[in-house]
Curated annotation (Swiss-Prot):
Keywords per UniProt: Menaquinone biosynthesis, Methyltransferase, S-adenosyl-L-methionine, Transferase
GO biological process, one term: methylation
Origin: domain of life: Bacteria
Keyword Transferase: yes
Biological source species: Thermus thermophilus (strain ATCC BAA-163 / DSM 7039 / HB27)
High-level lineage: Bacteria, Thermotogati, Deinococcota, Deinococci, Thermales
Annotated PANTHER family: 2-METHOXY-6-POLYPRENYL-1,4-BENZOQUINOL METHYLASE, MITOCHONDRIAL, METHYLTRANSFERASE
Protein name, per record: Demethylmenaquinone methyltransferase
Amino acid sequence: MFSEIAPRYDLLNRLLSFGADLRWRRRAVDLALEKAPKRILDLATGTGDLALMLKERAPGAEVVGADFAPPMLAIARRKAEARGLEVRFLEADALALPFPDGAFDAVTIAFGFRNFADYEKALGELYRVLAPGGRLVVLEFPPPPKGAFGLVYRVYFQRVLPFLGGLISGNFGAYRYLPESVEAFPAPEALKAMMAAAGFSVRYELLTFGVAAIHVGDRP
């Protein structure tokens, strides 16, 4: 599914979020770089947007982008080459990461965590590959907020977005999956508890009236 929508993935992210995803990603980068990490993993990197932002902001850091979809990675590599950025992109399974213990000082995930088949197992792997004192930053769509804004947002997210996304990408199934996966995703407090159970010290912030959320987990 993700491989099929790769060619228009970036365009759709910008259009369907009205450009807000770039602001959210920049905030995630700010939080990831607070501790001046030297080794950074961007997991579920997709076409590499966040990995490239990290490298631009921290040119002296080693940045690795990992994803399970080769077509996404191919686009990420082309983008890195075009921008003259040295980022290593590789294929990897989030539930069995091909890295030694403590390999990274920071791990970021933007809009990929909810696609993992086993959240607890993924968090265990993320904790394992982080060095002591390392930081995990998870940018995700929580379930839609309540109230009047939430009602309008649900109509857009469940009706308009799947139609437009399917029309532009040619894959209606992928953009029907998006709202379904968001509705099934843990609420911010539940994800915080899940990360804490994995050993992280956790805080989170809501963005754009709760449309997106960033969870920050520090490994002791």
